[in-house]
Design a protein with these regions (language model features):
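N-terminal secretory targeting modules
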Residues: 7-206, 216-218, 237, 405-407
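Conserved SGNH/GDSL esterase-like catalytic core that processes O-acyl groups on lipids
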Residues: 36, 54-60, 83, 87, ...
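Catalytic His-Asp segment of secreted/periplasmic serine-dependent ester chemistry enzymes
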Residues: 265, 325-408
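Sec-exported extracytoplasmic/periplasmic mature domains
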Residues: 211, 229, 233-237, 273-277, ...
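Short hydrophobic segments within beta-strands
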Residues: 206-207, 322
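Active-site segments of SGNH/GDSL-like serine hydrolases
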Residues: 284-289, 308-342
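Proline-centered loop/turn at the N-terminus of a beta-strand
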Residues: 242, 316-318, 356
């Protein structure tokens, strides 16, 4: 459940906790709002992300959370080692696999130009593309790079299938024949925005592999953020919201590096606060810190949460704190770590520091052993939920409360 600290909702059928006031938020300019996102990391030490691409087209397949009358994309070179030269980009409606709907392909420009060079450490929005898209629609964003990219900025563990081509510019091709190779990651693309004045704003699901949907079915769009997005679509116009992914597998609050991404403290502004139209963030983060360092003191994690809350509130963004799931039986489970998890969860529930609390621990735990995930919700590794577990999490969130935080 979500518990809210807003006086305006005292009459609502949700428990009330104390919490900090959130500054007033300005409307997103021109009604742009994020519909899809993926947090990026540095290239791996080996493999495709390390070698990068030359004279190839990457076809990233993404799934919208809300629709809109036009769109724009954001390409990232945040973790590149040299300028990223993009020669051609197209966006189309995806039909099946790497195939796109005939006639739906649109050229994407940057400042009116077909090509763009993005300095290393930077990212770039495209111009608006007049392509109407629906909620829960698959898009194919095809990015052609002629020159060698060097190590690539990417999102590993996408839990979705994308593609890359044989040599050449195949960005505008509707056929899948030039895309024989599957990749289970998103390269370069880190955001898609749409114009939709009926959407109140965006909710960012920020965290580690559970926020990213590990344990859910590949290509099924059954992460908890997908389930939540489907629920909020049923709200009246003006109260609906998009749901954006800012989860990274193996990510930690306090430490960072490699394909686990920068620490939550380091990446929070880029991956959460800078999302277009963001109004609220659900923070589900800390499990990996505890697993790797069970000797941490609760105050170390609590201080990090407080810092994230301060950052969000300074930009008028509400923060929902999610309790950490039980993980007895997981590879790095320890009794010491479980005590730390319980201490942190008590603070999340009872401190009043968050604007609301999502008690995912209560949803997922075995009622007969609170250190263990309920078997019906366990993906099998005792750490990540399965599809049913993610659906249960999404179902536990009071969407009326969430809508209040987003639109209030």
């Amino acid at each position: 459940m979500i518990r809210i600290a807003a006086a305006a909702l005292l009459a609502a059928v949700v428990p009330v906790v104390s919490g900090a006031a959130v500054p007033a938020r300005a409307a997103a300019p021109h009604a742009w709002v994020g519909t899809w996102s993926a947090a990026q990391v540095t290239a791996a030490a080996t493999g495709l992300s390390h070698t990068g691409f030359r004279d190839r087209t990457v076809r990233d397949i993404v799934h919208t959370s809300v629709g809109g009358s036009e769109l724009r994309i954001r390409i990232s070179n945040a973790f590149g080692t040299e300028p990223l030269e993009i020669a051609d980009v197209r966006v189309a409606l995806r039909e099946k696999g790497a195939r796109t709907v005939a006639g739906s392909s649109h050229r994407v420009t940057f400042g009116g130009r077909d090509a763009v060079t993005i300095p290393f450490g930077q990212r770039e929005f495209s111009d608006a593309v007049k392509l109407s898209v629906s909620a829960e629609q698959d898009l194919a964003v095809s990015i052609y790079v002629k020159q060698a990219t060097g190590p690539a900025t990417w999102h590993p563990a996408a839990i979705a299938t994308s593609y890359y081509s044989t040599p050449g510019d195949h960005a505008g091709a509707a056929s899948a024949s030039a895309y024989p190779d599957k990749i289970f990651a998103w390269y370069f693309l880190d955001g898609v925005d749409v114009v939709n004045p009926s959407v109140a704003g965006a909710v960012v699901t920020f965290g580690a592999s559970t926020s990213n949907g590990a344990g859910s079915t590949r290509d099924g769009n059954e992460r908890y953020l997908d389930d939540l997005a489907r629920r909020v679509l049923k709200l009246p116009a003006g109260l609906r919201m998009s749901v954006l992914n800012a989860g990274i597998s193996a990510n930690q609050l306090l430490a960072g590096g490699g394909t686990a991404g920068q620490s939550a403290l380091t990446r929070f502004y880029r991956d959460a606060i800078e999302q277009t139209g963001v109004r609220a963030v659900i923070i589900w983060e800390g499990t990996n810190d505890i697993g790797v360092h069970p000797d941490l003191h609760p105050s170390q994690l609590i201080s990090a949460y407080i810092e994230l809350i301060k950052i969000a509130h300074s930009y008028g963004v509400a923060v929902i704190g999610a309790t950490l799931q039980p993980d007895q039986g997981a590879n790095y489970y320890t009794a010491q770590g479980n005590k730390l998890r319980q201490s942190v969860n008590r603070w999340i529930r009872d401190s009043g520091a968050f604007d609301a609390v999502a008690d995912f621990d209560a949803v997922l735990r075995n009622p007969f052993d609170h250190a263990e995930m309920l078997p019906a919700y366990d993906s099998g590794d005792h750490l990540h939920p399965n599809n049913a577990g993610y659906q249960a999490i999404a179902n536990s969130i009071n969407v009326s409360t969430l809508s209040f935080l987003v639109s209030g």
